[in-house]
């Protein structure tokens, strides 16, 4: 960096295997302990292509690390309310506090744990996901999702807000529309927190769509 500018390290790579990256993160680019813990728990796998990343060692805000890359069959575990996923392909960009993913994946798996007991599996998935993370909460927004699964064609959107202070109530708003679908798959979209009575009523009331 030139005089008067903040020091910045720039990384550019055509191809990057994510599997061995997690153990090296702390030594290559030290981050706050809370962020490092999240990175370890995610246990990311897969491949990045066309990687662009900036590291500002003296920065104290979310711009300390910023990035953009094409994802190829990326997977990660659930942590801090964030979902688990497999076979994530698309374009990702962001920094330590916010980001977005433009998803275009085949054989896509998403698990909104612990809200839903089982992962959702789809033949094809296209979506826009945006997130923010700070010391108070993690927010994940999907303004549009279009997927193709065994149950039919699905359009959905959701907002999930998870508070770091567990004494505060978390929030979720999920809307799912099923076209040319099979009502047998209704239980797949029923949150685990529903009462047994309401869950049973929904299972039997929704037959097709």
Regions found by a protein language model. Give the residues of each.
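Polar/acidic, low-complexity leader/linker segments enriched in S/T/G and N/D
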Residues: 156-158
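Active-site pocket-lining segments that scaffold enzyme catalytic pockets across diverse folds
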Residues: 87
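Extended amphipathic, helix-rich lipid-handling scaffolds
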Residues: 1-78, 90-98, 102-151, 171-209
